[in-house]
Amino acid sequence: ELKRFKFVYKKGNLNQAASSVFCLYKHDELKNTVDNLFTDGTMVKLKDEYNSEEAINALEEKVNKHPLKHQLVSNIEIAKELLKEEKDFSDRTFTLTQYGNTHEKARNQLGMSRYGTDLQSTGIVGRPGQVFKVFVEAEDGAPLPQIVFSQQEGRFGHWKQEYQLKKGLNVITVPEIYNDSWSQKPIKGGPVYLMNRYTPQQQGKAPVVRIEGGEEFPLYNSGDDKAEFLEKLKAYKAKLDKDPANTVDVYEFNTTRFMYTGTAKAAYQVYVNEGVDVEESVQVWNTRIQDAFELSGLKDDPSDPTNDSTNVRTSIRLMQPYGAAYAASDHIGVQRHIQEIILRTDQDSINSILWGMMHEVGHQLDIATREWGEITNNMYSNNAYVNDGAGDRAAYSKIHNLLAPDDSSVNFNNLDGTIQLGMFWQLQLKKDTYWAELDSLYRKK
């Protein structure tokens, strides 16, 4: 039995050595046991020695007498639920990507002014006040992911809130992000995301996260089973019609180059009522953004890091009005009136928003050190227009009129935007690799 302590001070401050408080702790074997009931941090399977009602009941008796019962009882309750019935947690369990910080890569390595998102869709919507249980399995000592709660149709600069996760159980109450001052009045709540800005070299094995809480909404990842998705969309639309005051109107899809967050009502109208193929729909803007990457000389090739666009994506989402559309540092905001149009695949629908969509994408892709606001970003719009057969919006006749006089000394800054665009685009006409070579040089330098 311990009766005496001896403290030896090896270094003091100002030749004085002092101590304030010493706390003595007894090893808590019960807490250690309760913290290690499960095979891993997702808490979906009990270890063999605890996989029985007898074992858990015996532990529960001890926990009920423990001074820290309120901290230990949650694990006992989870264990009892697992013993009661076998559950399938696959739809709520996510193995996280380990792409590193692609937003930082887009900015620092590729020179883009705004492009890049690291949000990973869960297909779960959370509403303010709901309590989420988030279970995390990861290697000991590894950096851990975050969970991100969002507000559907939120405001620029105020639409999401991030929480750092720890290994094991995390209990988080969904925050309220909604603001009554907004012009559009969506239902409070929005999609829940996971964000893991680390690589295998930093983390070892990929973290696995399981989420309890919220409800599932229609999510389509390129290549998913289309029939299965449509059934989920129909069921969610029925719920939305039955209880619109308590159901967030949201639909989301993911492709190689971007994540889109819109409305379930628009998705139902286009995919169910109009019969548009969902895979063709999600590829419409993915293809055009990929074309913009290629115009800029980007390619998925890790062996060429200054031009490597592997895993670089953006987020395009329904947001509060801020002009017709806008490009922010972490998303492109669009408004309600084009929700159906974005999902349609006919050329008239595509052309009706083609310039504006690629104009905003161009803002994000534009290399900051050579960006000429509202001019160079339109290289991507014009490229899309030409590729889609919608014409070339460079004003060549105006350029010719300016060049015709012997004294042609109009300052570039005094020219209108179509002429300024033409000064760049004519070089692309001269050599179709001009823009790719120019951007590649900027990235290299």
Q: What feature does the model see in each segment?
A:
Residues 127, 139, 148-164, 171-259, ...:
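Zn2+-dependent metallopeptidase catalytic core
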Residues 239-445:
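Catalytic cores of extracellular degradative/oxidative enzymes
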Residues 7, 63, 134, 194, ...:
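Generic structural signal marking isolated hydrophobic packing positions
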Residues 1-83:
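Beta-rich interaction/scaffold domains
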Residues 19-22, 51, 58-222:
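Beta-strand-enriched, solvent-exposed domains that form extended recognition/catalytic surfaces
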Residues 20, 49, 120, 363, ...:
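Residues at structural and domain junctions
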